């Protein structure tokens, strides 16, 4: 299954790692791709990074793992058409 994780902090990375260990493809959405360079190298096969828009477009299931104050903006950047009809899990912290 393709999992899109919106948010690249500790929670988002931990969830992404868990889904990767279960054999899923995971894309982590971030505003700063450079921040995830080391994570991507360690995560290995099935892992990728992208913008919030690209991540929401990619995922069959979307995980929202942003800080509370960034959640509304992350959802706007993801694009409502990319979220429509998908399972969305909100673990906002």
What do the PLM-derived regions correspond to, one by one?
Residues 44-47, 52-89:
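Rossmann-like NAD(P)-binding element
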Residues 92:
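Active-site beta-alpha turn of Rossmann-fold NAD(P)-dependent dehydrogenases/reductases
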Residues 1-45:
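NAD(P)+-binding Rossmann beta1-loop-alpha1 motif at the extreme N-terminus of oxidoreductases
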């Amino acid at each position: 299954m393709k999992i899109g994780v919106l948010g690249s902090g500790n929670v988002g990375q931990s969830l992404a790692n868990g889904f990767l260990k279960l054999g899923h493809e995971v894309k982590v959405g971030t505003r700063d791709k450079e921040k995830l360079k080391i994570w991507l190298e360690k995560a290995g096969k099935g892992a990728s990074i992208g913008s919030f828009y690209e991540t929401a477009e990619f995922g069959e299931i979307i995980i929202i793992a942003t800080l509370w104050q960034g959640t509304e903006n992350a959802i706007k950047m993801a694009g409502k058409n990319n979220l429509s009809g998908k399972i969305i899990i909100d673990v906002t912290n």
